[in-house]
Amino acid sequence: MKRKMKMKLVRFGLAAGLAAQVFFLPYNALASTEHVTWNQQFQTPQFISGDLLKVNGTSPEELVYQYVEKNENKFKFHENAKDTLQLKEKKNDNLGFTFMRFQQTYKGIPVFGAVVTAHVKDGTLTALSGTLIPNLDTKGSLKSGKKLSEKQARDIAEKDLVANVTKEVPEYEQGKDTEFVVYVNGDEASLAYVVNLNFLTPEPGNWLYIIDAVDGKILNKFNQLDAAKPGDVKSITGTSTVGVGRGVLGDQKNINTTYSTYYYLQDNTRGNGIFTYDAKYRTTLPGSLWADADNQFFASYDAPAVDAHYYAGVTYDYYKNVHNRLSYDGNNAAIRSSVHYSQGYNNAFWNGSQMVYGDGDGQTFIPLSGGIDVVAHELTHAVTDYTAGLIYQNESGAINEAISDIFGTLVEFYANKNPDWEIGEDVYTPGISGDSLRSMSDPAKYGDPDHYSKRYTGTQDNGGVHINSGIINKAAYLISQGGTHYGVSVVGIGRDKLGKIFYRALTQYLTPTSNFSQLRAAAVQSATDLYGSTSQEVASVKQAFDAVGVK
C-alpha cells in the first residue's frame, strides 16, 4: 500500500476465402436508428446500437458477419469476417437476447484484447460492442513470421523482471500459458508473445509481459495481480456442520464447516465449496486447511479466518441470488482463501487462483478479511476476469477497479453490514476515525478525480487504475443515490437497479480494451435492455455520466 501524488494507490490485490459461401439474403438495416460511439484512436466504431440488421432465416452469428462486411469501410475492416471473428461464447439470456462474444484473429492468431460482443433479439442485430482492430491486412510487420521461441520470450521477460522489479529470482507459481498473439499499439502491429510471470516472493506479483516475437523487444509490461484462474482444491470428506466464531471487528457469526476428526473451514453448501486456509505467517500457499477441535472459533487468531470464510459465502450468495451467477466463473468454481499471509502484510489480493489476506501492521491495516467490501472487491476481480476480461491498465484497468468497488459496496449493502459508500473503512487506519481507502460518494476527499477533465494521465499505478476509478465510482454513486455534480442533476434509481445495469454491462457489453466512453454506452444499452429506451433508468445513467464528463 503506497501513497503517491497525495493519492492512495491501493491494489486489493485484479488486445482466404470462405469455406462455404455466405449468401446475403434480403435485409433491412435502419441506419437512422444506429447510435455509434467512436474509437478516437482508430476513428472506427467501438459501440453501435439500434436496429442494425435483420435477415430472415439467418443465425445470430451470421448476422454479425454480414453486418461487419456490409460496413467494411466504417470499420476499416476488409477481411473475411467469418474467418476472422472466432465465436467464443453464445447464450440466450432471460430478456430474450442471444448474446455472443467474438475474438478477432489474424490468419488464425488472436489479436490481443480485440474482443467484440453482439446481441440479437427477434432476429435483429441490436448491438455490437468492442473495437475491431482495423487494416491488419495492410501491416507488413505481420508478414515476416516469428523468430523467437516461447522459451526465449520467457527468458527475456524473466531477465527484465529480476533486473527492474524483484531484484532477485522469484519462485514462480503456475500462471497462464504463454500465448502467441498479434499485439497492436497505436498504428504499430507486431507478432508477440504474452508471457505471464506469477510469484509470491519477494513480493507478490502477477506480471504480464508482451514480447516482440521477431526482435525480442519488450512492447508492454504491467502487474495484473488480480487476474483469476481456478486452482486445484483438495477437499475433506466428512459431515457438513455449522460452527460459530468471532470476526475481526468482534461480531459473532455462524460459519459452515466440515467434520472429519477435526472441524474444517470447508463450506460444502455453496457450489464446489468454500475453503479457508492458515498460511501461518508464511508466503507458501495455500497453507493448511483451517482445523479446529470444537467448532468454536473465538480465539483472536481465528478472527481473520472466520471473516474470510463467512464473507466469501456472502459474496457467493449475492451473485447467485441477485444475478443468478454461480461463483466467480459462473460454473461454481471453488473459492479458496488464505489468511495470516506473511507478517504485518498490508494487502489482500488474488494470486491468480485464490484469495490472500494479510494481517496488516496494526496501523495502516488490521486483518484485511475483516472488511466485507474488501472480500467482495477481490472476488469481483475474478468475475471480471471471466467476463469482460478488462486489461489491468489505463482506462480499462480503472473500469476494472471501479467495478470491484461498486460490487464490493453492493455486497456490503446486501449483507447490511454497516453499509456505506466508502471502501475498506472497516480495516483501514484503525487509529483514524472515519478514514477509508476510497470514497465513491466523494472521490476527491482522498485526492481521486471525480470528473474526466481531472483524470490522471501518467504511467504510475498502471496508468491510474486506482486513481481514475474515482470517476466511474462517482457516476455509479449518482446513478444510485442521485444528486447534483458540476451543475448536472441526476435522479437516483437505487442500488438494486445500479447493480443490475452494471452487472449486465460487465458480463455482456464490456470488452478487454473498453474505455470510459464505451462503458457509458454499455451502461446506457444495459439500462435500455432492462427498462426501455424512454425509461428514467436510461435517463439517469446518461445524466450520471454527463455529470462526470464522460461522453
UniProtKB/Swiss-Prot annotation:
Residues 1-31 form the signal peptide. Binds 4 Ca(2+) ions per subunit. Binds 1 zinc ion per subunit. Its cofactor is Ca(2+); Zn(2+). One of its GO terms (cellular component) is extracellular region. It catalyses: Preferential cleavage: Xaa-|-Leu > Xaa-|-Phe. Induction: Is expressed in the stationary phase. Up-regulated by NprA. Ca(2+) 2 binds at residues 373, 412, 420, 422, 425. Ca(2+) 4 binds at residues 429, 432, 435. This is Thermolysin. It comes from Geobacillus stearothermophilus (Bacillus stearothermophilus). The gene is nprS.
